[in-house]
Amino acid sequence: AMPNMMDRMADALASRGVTSAWVVHGHGGLDELAVSGPNTVFELHDGQVHTFEVNAKDFGIAVSTLDDIRGGEPEDNLAILRDTFAGKPGPVRDIVTFNAGCALYVAGIAGDVSDGIERARASIDSGAAVAVLENVIAITHREATRMETQP
């Protein structure tokens, strides 16, 4: 999120009945948590908003540059994601597990961010993440075909 909009976004979520959320501004201007430096977080929890910074390096994740995670054409990005979900180590896996780990914490599935990161890594290592990815791809293709054939 844009830094000057984060408080309004958190307030809007609270007004809509959301009880747990993070509105983030990633290092380098990302709209997700970055592994390149500190990230600003507005945390909504039970109607209260708290602001803090979270840094991937504090969870043992190597610092990487934005160029290390930059994608390209959709086909290239899918190949990168498939490699990542197949267990390929590196900056893309790091940013995926960091964001997923934080999301698992915010959703109440993980007890803390470290636990969430470990769960995300386990999902990749077990093959569960790639199974979900392939299912999403299949559903997307099926729905696109269905929409193309409708009058």
Predicted regions and their residues:
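Glycine-rich anion-binding loops and their surrounding alpha/beta cores
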Residues: 1-151
